[in-house]
């Protein structure tokens, strides 16, 4: 787990049998998300083909059904899902947006908020 001064993050790494590492992240209650992944979701992912992402996602979704359809369970599933897409991109040598269907617009509007209240130089040092 890593952290900024004001916010903790969980970095989820999944390594394939071939040594390819996919990286996902979660920004809600990282200690609890880690426990959820380690205890409940990892056994559902080990040995699966990352390209069977819908099947894996459904297994994880059903496993967390009793917790509701938001919050901790969904954050944990999302961290794994992001890592699986990263693996697929690395295996195919394509950016994930291409795997998701490619470009849909000529231009994409950009949005930024003042989430980080420190100067960017200070954040880069962290």
What are these regions (language model features)?
Residues 1, 90, 94-107:
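N-terminal amphipathic alpha-helix/helix-capping segment at the start of soluble metabolic enzymes
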Residues 1-13:
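Short, Gly/Pro- and small/polar-rich lid/capping loops
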Residues 8-10, 20, 76, 106-108:
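A generic secondary-structure signal marking the coil-to-beta-strand transition
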Residues 15-91:
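Metal- or metallocofactor-binding catalytic centers and their adjacent structured scaffolds
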Residues 106-126:
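Metal-dependent enolase-superfamily TIM-barrel catalytic cores that perform enediolate-based chemistry
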């Amino acid at each position: 787990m890593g952290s900024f001064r004001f916010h903790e993050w969980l970095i989820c790494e999944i390594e394939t049998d071939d040594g390819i590492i996919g990286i996902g992240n979660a920004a809600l209650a990282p200690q609890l998300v880690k426990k959820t992944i380690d205890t409940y979701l990892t056994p559902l992912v080990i040995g699966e083909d990352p390209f069977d992402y819908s099947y894996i996602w459904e297994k994880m979704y059903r496993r967390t059904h009793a917790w509701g359809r938001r919050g901790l369970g969904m954050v944990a599933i999302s961290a794994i899902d992001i890592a699986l897409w990263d693996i697929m991109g690395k295996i195919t040598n394509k950016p994930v947006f291409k795997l998701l269907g490619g470009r849909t617009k000529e231009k994409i509007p950009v949005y930024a908020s003042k989430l980080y209240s420190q100067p960017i130089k200070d954040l880069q040092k962290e």
